Regions:
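Acidic, Ser/Thr/Pro-rich intrinsically disordered cytosolic tails and loops
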Residues: 2-230
């Protein structure tokens, strides 16, 4: 047996070993990131600022907001893990507000991004997007992942995912209010907004045109200043 012939099985074994190692390493990484998002606690400053802005919210309401921000992070994580790098729009005004406040805690936010996504999660305001259709596409992507995570059929939804329903449930002023198409009546002031199952009050759509669709995108992590206090 020649040397080259005897080396080939060894090379193939090394390649196979590397593939197996990468597969299980990825599984461990996914499990670790998922567990981190489930367990991490937002800084106290975020809750304090939300209560100042929305004084009618109680502790349970704030917990619901935090839960849905973490759910949005899971939606991003899951989408990226499945190879989808397209941006995902934020459907909730109150959750977006919590996200904004968390970003101001620069050190904590940067650490969360690194441990949850492996890179920095940028917040892209709707105003910087090219057109409303771009925001719409991002919202549809969020809708599909949110529905799948809650066992809802995206194209035949019997209920709204919690992330889409939260603003109305918490009675947030000038909120993003979604209803299912089957609830719309002919001639009512309802127009399509996300997937074909979801509609948005046309007045609110116009009123919130500059806010709907804040989105997330991952990129390189730059330096940051100090974090916020508890």
């Amino acid at each position: 047996m020649s040397l080259s012939t005897s080396v080939i099985p060894l090379i193939l074994l090394c390649i196979l070993g590397r593939i197996v190692y990468q597969y299980f390493s990825r599984k461990v990484c996914i499990k670790r990131r998922k567990a981190y998002i489930d367990a991490f606690l937002l800084p106290n400053r975020v809750a304090r600022k939300l209560k100042e802005r929305y004084p009618h919210l109680d502790e349970r309401n704030i917990s619901d907001v935090f839960r849905e921000l973490k759910e949005y992070f899971h939606i991003i994580r899951e989408s990226k893990e499945n190879g989808n790098e397209a941006f995902l729009s934020m459907p909730s005004q109150i959750v977006d507000g919590a996200w904004h406040e968390f970003i101001l805690c620069t050190r904590e936010y940067a650490e969360c991004c690194q441990r949850a996504f492996g890179r920095f999660l940028h917040h892209t305001p709707a105003e910087s997007m090219r057109n409303p259709a771009q925001m719409q596409e991002g919202l549809e992507r969020t809708w599909r992942v949110a529905c799948n995570r809650e066992g809802i059929k995206p194209n035949d939804a019997a209920a709204l995912p919690r992330l889409f329903a939260l603003d109305a449930v918490l009675e947030i002023p000038d909120c993003h209010h979604y209803v299912l198409n089957r609830e719309a009546r002919a001639g009512s002031a309802l127009v399509p907004v996300a997937p074909r199952d979801v509609t948005l009050d046309s007045e609110k759509k116009i009123h919130h045109a500059s806010h709907i669709g804040c989105s997330a995108g991952c990129g390189g992590c730059g330096g940051g200043c100090g974090g916020c206090g508890g």
